[in-house]
Amino acid sequence: MPSISTNITLAFITALLGMLIFRSHLMSSLLCLEGMMLSMFILSTLTILSLHFTTSFMMPILLLVFAACEAAVGLALLVTVSNTYGLDYIQNLNLLQC
């Protein structure tokens, strides 16, 4: 079990580093965010199951709900920016300010 937790933590750190490295493109940032949410889901599920927290069985499901909402908003923003400007560079998001 500790090796699984270590691997999931490394997956989260890798996705976080990917977010820092590929921050110029919106699609790459969204993929890294999804990887971070997936590793957080797996780690929270494993923690709850191994420590027998019966009162917090709904936390991973709630995390998945928020991940789905984040993905939907991110993809809507990606489609809007790419249709408006033709690129998915994050520098174009500065043009959306009022």
Swiss-Prot record:
EC number of the protein: 7.1.1.2
S-S pairs: none
UniProt topology in membrane: Multi-pass membrane protein
Catalysed reactions, semicolon-separated: a ubiquinone + NADH + 5 H(+)(in) = a ubiquinol + NAD(+) + 4 H(+)(out)
Compartments reported by the entry: Mitochondrion inner membrane
Main localization category: mitochondrion
Class in the EC hierarchy, top level: translocase
Gene Ontology CC, one term: mitochondrial inner membrane
Protein keywords: Electron transport, Membrane, Mitochondrion, Mitochondrion inner membrane, NAD, Respiratory chain, Translocase, Transmembrane, Transmembrane helix, Transport, Ubiquinone
Known partners and oligomeric status: Core subunit of respiratory chain NADH dehydrogenase (Complex I) which is composed of 45 different subunits.
Family: Belongs to the complex I subunit 4L family.
Name of the protein in question: NADH-ubiquinone oxidoreductase chain 4L
Annotated source species: Hapalemur aureus (Golden bamboo lemur)
